Amino acid sequence: AIIPKQFLKRIERTGFGQFLFYEWRFDEAGNINPEFEPNKPRYAGASVLISRANFGCGSSREHAPWAIMDYGFRCVIAPSFADIFYNNCFKNGILPIKLSEEQVEDLFQRTAKHDNYQLNVDLNEKTITDDYGLRIEFDLDEHRRQFLLQGLDDIGLTLQHESEILAYEQKRAAKQGA
């Protein structure tokens, strides 16, 4: 689980990073599991998470992207995502990138091969690069790209049209008052 159910009792967006992958990151005694890949020192501070297919399955609540974001990941790369989770990522400032299984496997291999391996995700250019010649272009709806580039959520998007909304409300109120 991205975040176990016992940690879903709050509605604040922050503080969930400590519970991310809790059942894998920690053993039964609450000690850090050194075998869990993201716990290894070489991944400290990583902002890109690489995963297998159907990432986010069973995580329809927004707590999952809140935990991912709070932990420090800004991008998740996988061959596929659960639909609700995928949409919730955009609503919470996380870039989910769909690549082929072969491309994702190549990223896993590169990560294992090179110490201090770093992926560079360029949202403007819609590319993923590394220092070893990798260049992958990814597809992303332009509306969603702009949404992320501008740091918007649904409310922020609506507020961009505040003057038009107010003008409409005034016009409608004037018609109803006549």
From Swiss-Prot:
Its EC number is 4.2.1.33. It comes from Paenibacillus polymyxa (Bacillus polymyxa). GO terms for cellular component: 3-isopropylmalate dehydratase complex. It holds the Pfam family Aconitase_C. Pathway: Amino-acid biosynthesis; L-leucine biosynthesis; L-leucine from 3-methyl-2-oxobutanoate: step 2/4. GO terms for molecular function: 3-isopropylmalate dehydratase activity. It is an enzyme of class 4 (lyase). Heterodimer of LeuC and LeuD. InterPro entries: 3-IsopropMal_deHydase_ssu, Aconitase/3IPM_dehydase_swvl, AconitaseA/IPMdHydase_ssu_swvl, IPMI_Swivel, LeuD. Keywords: Amino-acid biosynthesis, Branched-chain amino acid biosynthesis, Leucine biosynthesis, Lyase. Catalyzes the isomerization between 2-isopropylmalate and 3-isopropylmalate, via the formation of 2-isopropylmaleate. Belongs to the LeuD family. LeuD type 1 subfamily. It catalyses: (2R,3S)-3-isopropylmalate = (2S)-2-isopropylmalate. One of its GO terms (biological process) is L-leucine biosynthetic process. This is 3-isopropylmalate dehydratase small subunit.
